[in-house]
Amino acid sequence: MSKKILLAEDDEDNRDLVSFVLQRSRLGAELIIAENGQEAVDKAFESIPNLILMDMQMPVMDGWTAIPILKGDKRTKHIPIIAFTAQAKPEDKVRTLEIGCAEHYSKPMDPEELIALIRKYLAD
């Protein structure tokens, strides 16, 4: 059974880049795309991914709102969430950890670093 990664990202270029990096990594993980936080919540409840990469600033519902919903639900509270964001101030990092993120990953993306982080959370 392949692992599932949910990417919540409103920027099409970032979605395409993450998809490309995952394909090149040969992790064999299925990538599920959500373009905003509400879609991320809905798709997480539907698919129960193994890992969530969550942009913090998106339309409709942002990551700051979506993450507490996911962490407050028994179906998804166990899923590690990586804040995938351009917000890199120390207080932003602290806040993402306080709301339940396992990691805070600041954009711009370094493909090798991102894959290493994903491998860490997909390891059996």
Please place each PLM-identified region on the residue numbering.
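Helix N-cap/capping motif at the beta->alpha junctions
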Residues: D13, I33-D42, G63-A66
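Active-site beta3 strand of CheY-like receiver
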Residues: S47-L53
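Two-component/phosphorelay signaling modules centered on CheY-like receiver
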Residues: E12-I32
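Receiver (REC) domain active-site loop signature in two-component systems and cognate sites
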Residues: M58
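Alpha4 helix (beta4-alpha4-beta5 surface) of REC/receiver domains from two-component response regulators
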Residues: S19, T65, A88-H104, M109, ...
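Conserved acidic carboxylate
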Residues: E9
